[in-house]
Amino acid sequence: MKTQFVILIVAVVLLQLIANSEAFLSTLWNAAKSIFGKRGLRNLDNLDDDIFEPEMSEADLRYLQDLLR
């Protein structure tokens, strides 16, 4: 009886590991598809315009410089 119980517990644990790893791998696969897909690569091209565009005005910069003196 103990052997059957141990086999049952091991089987349940292994099935849980398989189910969890399948969900994890499918999430990784979907992330890779969205990053490296045609639309994903096309959307990454637009990031350069937003990064280098300053959002602070000259007055804001002067005020910060006065605060840091």
UniProtKB/Swiss-Prot annotation:
Compartments, as annotated in UniProt: Secreted; Target cell membrane
Record keywords: Amidation, Antibiotic, Antimicrobial, Cleavage on pair of basic residues, Cytolysis, Hemolysis, Membrane, Secreted, Signal, Target cell membrane, Target membrane
Phenylalanine amide: residues bearing it: F36
Q: List the disulfide bonds.
A: none
Q: Which GO terms describe its biological process?
A: defense response to bacterium; killing of cells of another organism
Q: Which residues form the propeptide?
A: 40-69
User: Could you say which residues are annotated as the site Important for activity?
Assistant: W29
Expression across tissues: Expressed by the venom gland.
Extent of the signal sequence: 1-23
**GO CC annotation, single:** other organism cell membrane
Which family, according to UniProt?
Belongs to the non-disulfide-bridged peptide (NDBP) superfamily. Short antimicrobial peptide (group 4) family.
Q: What does this protein do?
A: Amphipathic peptide that shows antibacterial activities against both Gram-positive (MIC=10 uM, 20 uM and 20 uM against S.aureus, B.subtilis and S.agalactiae, respectively) and Gram-negative bacteria (MIC=20 uM, 10 uM, and 10 uM against E.coli, S.typhi, and P.aeruginosa, respectively). Is mildly hemolytic at its MIC range, but shows a strong cytotoxic activity at higher concentrations, reaching 84% lysis at 50 uM.
Designated name of the protein = Amphipathic peptide CT2
Q: Which organism is it from?
A: Vaejovis mexicanus smithi (Mexican scorpion)
